[in-house]
Amino acid sequence: MSFSVEVLAGIAIELQRGIGHQDRFQRLITTLRQVLACDASALLRYESRQFIPLAIDGLAQDVLGRRFTLEGHPRLEAIARAGDVVRFPADSDLPDPYDGLIPGQESLKVHACVGLPLFAGQNLIGALTLDAMTPEQFEVFSDEELRLVAALAAGALSNALLIEQLESQNMLPGSSGVFEPIKETHMIGLSPAMTQLKKEIEIVAGSDLNVLIGGETGTGKELVAKAIHQGSPRAVNPLVYLNCAALPESVAESELFGHVKGAFTGAISNRSGKFEMADNGTLFLDEIGELSLALQAKLLRVLQYGDIQRVGDDRSLRVDVRVLAATNRDLREEVLAGRFRADLFHRLSVFPLFVPPLHERGDDVVLLAGYFCEQCRLRLGLSRVVLSPDARRHLLNYGWPGNVRELEHAIHRAVVLARATRAGDEVVLEAQHFALSEDVLPAPPAESFLALPACRNLRESTENFQREMIRQALAQNNHNWAASARALETDVANLHRLAKRLGLKD
């Protein structure tokens, strides 16, 4: 068997049919898996000595959440170094990164593997991996034919990365124009809620607006702040972190604004505060709702006039700082209760973001579980850590009141338990390794001023409410439109029309 012109043309046509990069990537690897009759295929992006899965076919869903470092995966390191088609013999002693991750074949190891490095010019930008349980599966294809496949995949990935960079440059003045792939932010998730959040981050990152990040405890608000900073013109300067909840009132002002020698007992020298440290960069104030009203007033002055005063000093210092603030409180309620200044709230919430709770993110739970499994594998020096099908279902059925942080701890604990009950360096996580209650119900969605921004009129408010209702229904029903329509008690055709009118569908 060999590739015909018709086969290659068919692959190219499938790429053109895709709507958006992700759809094109999925069409590419699905078509390749069919053409090559292999058991699994994956398109990976290369960045910072690791491969990041972009699209998979025939592999467990949690693979999309894993990050494959070169140091931890010798086969992928060989692909990255080769510069050409890499064929691994069936008896290769190099472990395959997908062992145990092909559904229905969890107990078997991959026998045939081909790796195709993908280049943009001289730069490695990714790889295409093809795996089969039959040892001789890829012998009928020549290296030249596989190079043609690699060229098609490299073109699709290179175009996607270039468009991504150009879109970013439109928001970042002074960009160099040199091809530089956008950096990974570890914001893992493909659910509608996370896709929307990522879009909002892209919109606001390139501006210099202050941002208020809301969400339940453990949802990943700090990661959002890092992503905003990383995508901003200030990314070359520091991102300074301060947890306001951990600040005793007696030292809070000094931590924020600094102090001069002799300002108080123990002030034995001049000391810069967080605002000075973050000059020309970004200051992330976590749990900002915990600040006292007196400190809120001083923080407001910095946001208004851009100057600070060290404790014990009469002089003012100019600072250029972007403030990102996070809270798990409803600050609008805090304002009404007199515990938070209304003027500071409005200064901070120019562009509010809301990080969705984990129970609203659908299958993102499995992707995140894969990410934490890979972290545990590297940390404990194991050859593999995989989730059984029962374990995946168990994780999806749980409500996760502690959100992503609870999931991370649950995975780490389960790996330790599973490792203790099984000899060797291969760990399979089963449902019984997780101390989770099956009857835990998802926490009710957080009512937040962040979920729906202030609107000018009734129509705009109604449309925003409808958008949020549809997004939540889709997230809770794994993006199944028919199931979402039933949950909303409406006809599916009407739901599609409404979603198009509201800009939720093309």
Swiss-Prot record:
Keywords: ATP-binding, DNA-binding, Nucleotide-binding, Phosphoprotein, Transcription, Transcription regulation
Alphabetized SMART domains for the sequence: AAA, GAF
CDD domains attached to this UniProt entry: AAA
A GO molecular-function annotation: ATP hydrolysis activity
Binding locations of ATP: 215-222, 278-287
Domain annotation Sigma-54 factor interaction: ranges: 187-416
Ranges annotated as DNA-binding: 481-500
Pathway the protein contributes to: Nitrogen metabolism; nitric oxide reduction
Pfam families found in the cross-reference section: GAF (PF01590), Sigma54_activat (PF00158)
GO biological process, one term: phosphorelay signal transduction system
Domain of life: Bacteria
Modification 4-aspartylphosphate occurs at: 57
Family annotation (InterPro entries): AAA+_ATPase, GAF, GAF-like_dom_sf, Homeodomain-like_sf, NorR, P-loop_NTPase, Sigma_54_int, Sigma_54_int_dom_ATP-bd_1
NCBIfam families assigned: PRK05022.1 (NF003451)
Purpose of the protein: Required for the expression of anaerobic nitric oxide (NO) reductase, acts as a transcriptional activator for at least the norVW operon. Activation also requires sigma-54.
Name of the protein described by the UniProt record: Anaerobic nitric oxide reductase transcription regulator NorR
